[in-house]
Amino acid sequence: ATLRGDFRDDSRPGRGDDFRAIRGDGSMSAAFAAVNRSKRGIAVDLAHPEGRRVAFALGRRADVLIENFLPGVAERQGLGYAAVSAAKPGIVYAYVTGFGQDGPLARRPGYNLIAQGMAGIMALTGHPGDPPTRAGGSISDLAASFLTFGMVQAALVHRARGGRGQHLDVNLLAS
């Protein structure tokens, strides 16, 4: 978040990001602090119209919007690519999910451990004869975040060269 941008992390009111407490005292872990350095946090309750209005207003002012809801959730909230790009045609909008926006697993939640197992990464780690072993670190999450970063940068260059905003679909399994 130190690339000279204004970054916001929208979280649930009263709960925040689950990553905040990993290996920490419950307030902020070192991992959370490293990943979220220089970001400004805001709590928005998308279950209420005012929360959706605030989120939409932020999206309309943004150059890039990245969300990680299950497919269809942002659309039901009026915050999907079609709605935001109608208000801000140049938006670069990235969906980051476990399994992509369509396909047989699209509606299922996904996280690092599931992606590692389904991608076969766990079969490649550990010792011969042992059951599948989780790779150290959240490799699927990291791969998806690096892929999202690269795709967003390419989309911003495309837009700067006279193109339009873009809709990006990133998922943990394919990353």
What label would you give each PLM region?
Residues A1-H167, L172:
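N-terminal helix-loop segment corresponding to the beta1-alpha1 unit
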